[in-house]
């Protein structure tokens, strides 16, 4: 079996892999592959290496704020160079290596390393990255990123998309290159959702849905959970201003209500503001960063999950975020915006 070497520019609480990355690694490990994740520890405070149930995390330790696009752009080449050197070192002792690079910010390094080392490259595209950063960077830069991504796709041996809208976008880019639309339409996304699974097999571009492991969401625990004394609304995730997830607006609203508690978990530049607002409100509870292994239990214990993404951001509007599937797995309704593709799905399926 192969040694799969992943690259990712971010980690979550405690320096661990995000759920979607960890789930992919677990699946590969169960198939008999060995997995190494080369990840950028942007706190610069965690251990250099950690062994997990699915493989090993190797961390590039360099401080870099999550919301500072200019600083990130300056420091990104350092991470990509470090990743390349690690892979070249592994190649001296391993014969069967597959590269698995996550999102556009790593892809240029992935293509370079793939060509240099003559190794197959899988591009795991979690989101419309140019659409995500549009607003944090200028429209011109976002369009250049779109064209860059389209050019790099031709150098990938395989491409993975989780969401239907992103699949439709990538499919268009493979056909039209940089002239393809910046984003797919809602109609195109729903067409992809209706496609049979066999259409995603044995093709360069495939769709692997953001499915949760149900053993983390035991049915007996869900069916027997005790009713909360107050309605508990839960948000666990990144706490940043851009793109907005409606956290501050929700705090303002909930603080004026009775019979409800807002539980917030995560890390980011909004934490100091959230702590100040918490002091003024009895029904806002900031829990601090939540370990990925505890997210399922927190979700089961809640009465609803909040995922109010800003619809003005094109990536938000057409995404199928991780929180949607966590809420579904826990049999908990999700509160979101009807303008989102996710909102239309929630309304259609009556799950929030």
Predicted regions and their residues:
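N-terminal subdomain of nucleotide-sugar transferases
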Residues: 1-45, 49, 158, 175, ...
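Conserved donor-binding/catalytic core segment of Leloir-type glycosyltransferases
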Residues: 4, 210-212, 216, 225-255, ...
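Membrane-proximal helix-turn-helix segments that form the acceptor-binding/catalytic region
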Residues: 23-26, 80, 84-91, 108, ...
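Nucleotide-sugar donor phosphate/pyrophosphate-binding loop at the beta->alpha transition
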Residues: 77-78, 117-122, 129-152, 168-178, ...
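A short, active-site helix/loop in glycosyltransferases that binds the activated sugar's phosphate group
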Residues: 142, 146, 150-204, 344-348
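Nucleotide-activated donor-binding/catalytic signature segment of Leloir-type glycosyltransferases, i.e.
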Residues: 230, 272-304
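Glycosyltransferase donor-sugar binding loop
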Residues: 236-240, 261-274, 288
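Nucleotide-sugar-dependent
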Residues: 241-245, 291-298, 305-325, 335-344
